[in-house]
Amino acid sequence: MEKTIAINAGSSSLKFQLYDMPSERVITAGIVERIGLKDSIFTITVDGEKIKEIIDIPDHEIAVQMLLEKLINHKVIGSYDEITGIGHRVVHGGERFPESVYIDDQVIKDIEALSELAPLHNPANVTGIKAFRKILPDVVSVAVFDTAFHQTMPPASYLYSLPYSYYEDYGIRKYGFHGTSHKYVSERAAELLGRPVEELRLLTCHLGNGASIAAIEGGKSMDTSMGFTPLAGVSMGTRSGNIDPALIPFIMEKTGKTAEQVLDVLNKESGMLGVSGISSDLRDLEDEAAKGNDRAELALQVFVDRIHKYIGSYAARMNGVDAIIFTAGIGENSSYIREKVLRGLEFMGVYWDPALNQVRGEERFLNYPHSPVKVIIIPTNEELMIARDVETIKNNH
């Protein structure tokens, strides 16, 4: 049996999912948290049972070693030879990587060079890649980029109206993120609609603590709300989304903060947390709003308002929409936010059933049968997309 492992390495964490391929059956999944701290947490699910241990895991290499040992100890695999492919999520591929790629030394160098575009994520992704290569050097490794799917955007979508030399010299442009998720739900939507993705106009709403909207026409990303970084676009859990750029020097002058500190505020203290003053967690805000907290209600309204702006502009951009898709933590689970987003879209031909909307995390249509525009909840599955790309590249390598 051939097995592929999908890896998402963060600065202090390592998420994994092991697949039997090509059947795409999930064998096990888990996460190593608090890597580098004394009380690291190792969690793995075996035969439906979640096993949690608190152990000292000083670095990613030890985390990988431990993960592989646990797979043997729990009899998930008989030997390391059963793992025939490793897929790594990499946040930023820039223009260099328009698609997933076989990892060699040059690819690692290129990903490291792109770290200035994603300083929080790419270095951690590379650490994960190197740790696996050291322990399983002969297994096919593949990098799957969050930005790759959006590389089909036309220049009018990705260029900022800045001096063109900034794009040529520094790579300043819109890149977009959550690409693996947008790609998965768009392909799955086509399956559910029974139509080729090539003839569909889709609006995909990846709404989680980080959130982005994408306009997908003919299976290709035409535009997306995140920009040069994942800070742009709609209001999010702790991120501001789009603001007037002149606010940055203004805030610096008023508060005495450095540019770096203001950026920190925009990334970590803004969005729903900033407006509400309570929490970045949507569930807390829904509870508070229900109790009559005006600021919690306002934070939710701002979130929905920004989503509406993208839905309207992207519908115009594609000259219509065939389906709106909700995915990720909020999109899949919050009937409240879906209702607020869908209300007022009747002019576009969106007719949805409030009774169908009362679900959490399951794949289903929310529209009435006669609705010209379909509305679908599709739980995202980035790990499966990673495993599929590994399979494709492994078979062609």
UniProtKB/Swiss-Prot annotation:
Pathway: Metabolic intermediate biosynthesis; acetyl-CoA biosynthesis; acetyl-CoA from acetate: step 1/2. Its main location: cytoplasm. The keyword Transferase applies. Mg(2+) binds at N8, E382. It catalyses: acetate + ATP = acetyl phosphate + ADP. One of its GO terms (biological process) is acetate metabolic process. Pfam families: Acetate_kinase. Its cofactor is Mg(2+); Mn(2+). Keywords: ATP-binding, Cytoplasm, Kinase, Magnesium, Metal-binding, Nucleotide-binding, Transferase. Mg(2+). Can also accept Mn(2+). CDD domains: ASKHA_NBD_AcK_PK (cd24010). It comes from the Bacteria. Substrate binds at R89. ATP binds at K15, H206, L207, G208, N209, G210, D281, L282, R283, G329, I330, G331, E332, N333. It is found in: Cytoplasm. GO terms for cellular component: cytoplasm. The active site is at D146. Homodimer. NCBIfam families: ackA (TIGR00016). HAMAP family: Acetate_kinase. PANTHER family: ACETATE KINASE, ACETATE KINASE-RELATED. This is Acetate kinase 2.
